[in-house]
Amino acid sequence: MSSHGDASVLPKIALESINDYSYVKSVFRQAIQEKLAIHLPEQASREAGMGREDQLRIRVKEMLNELIESTFSIIQENVTINGFDANSALQDPKNSDQIEPFDLALRTRVQQLFNEVEDAHVLVARYRKSVPAQYEKAYVDAMEQQTAFLRNVKDDYVSLQDKEVENPDEQTSTTVFRKEDIDRYEQTIAKVAYLKKNLPRVVARLEKTP
């Protein structure tokens, strides 16, 4: 694989603003000027030019400026400014202001919300398994209570009939139920009616939950 091919897959240098780009360029320019001052001092140049900067130093400065501009023109293809290509951002600075800088706190909050959604999905999946079984058990228990109550009522009725046969003069009533038995019967019937009405709706709601 060629080196050019390797370079094509490298990530671009990401800068947040045009000011960052200008700062990097100014640092690069300053470093070159420092090298120029070492190798072609301005004072020596003016002494050679009789008080004026000699032509050699002037030409070297021009070439170095061309080098700086050429270098940063080339690297613009590998630089982004606030998510935009450097060329586009530098030509129209408004482009680089359309996207907000990365917000770590906002990303953390989004991750927390995502985790809460995941937890909710797990909870719903758990309810899909447990809630129908709980309703079914409550329904079965209510039916068993009702059946046991009716069986007791039947036994009491038979017992009262036997007493009437054995003691016809004793006042007994096979048509009057004890108040607590009636209340218990009504409560059981209410439970069964509630479960019968709400169980299909609860199951359907859980099945529709994503």
Curated annotation (Swiss-Prot):
Superkingdom of the organism of origin: Eukaryota
Gene Ontology biological process terms from the UniProt entry? cell division; meiotic cell cycle; mitotic sister chromatid segregation
Q: Which UniProt keywords apply?
A: Cell cycle, Cell division, Centromere, Chromosome, Kinetochore, Meiosis, Mitosis, Nucleus
One Pfam entry for this protein is Mis14
GO CC, one annotated term = cytosol
UniProt keyword Nucleus, yes or no = yes
KW GTP-binding (keyword) present: no
Tell me the InterPro entries matching this sequence. Answer: Mis14/Nsl1
Q: Where in the cell is it found?
A: Nucleus; Chromosome, Centromere; Chromosome, Centromere, Kinetochore
PANTHER family attached to this UniProt entry:
KINETOCHORE-ASSOCIATED PROTEIN NSL1 HOMOLOG
User: Subunit notes for this chain?
Assistant: Component of the NMS super complex which consists of mis12, mis13, mis14, ndc80, nnf1, nuf2, sos7, spc7, spc24 and spc25. Interacts with mis12.
What the protein does?
Acts as a component of the NMS (Ndc80-MIND-Spc7) super complex which has a role in kinetochore function during late meiotic prophase and throughout the mitotic cell cycle. Required for correct chromosome segregation where it has a role in the formation and/or maintenance of specialized chromatin at the centromere.
Tell me what this protein is called.
Kinetochore protein mis14
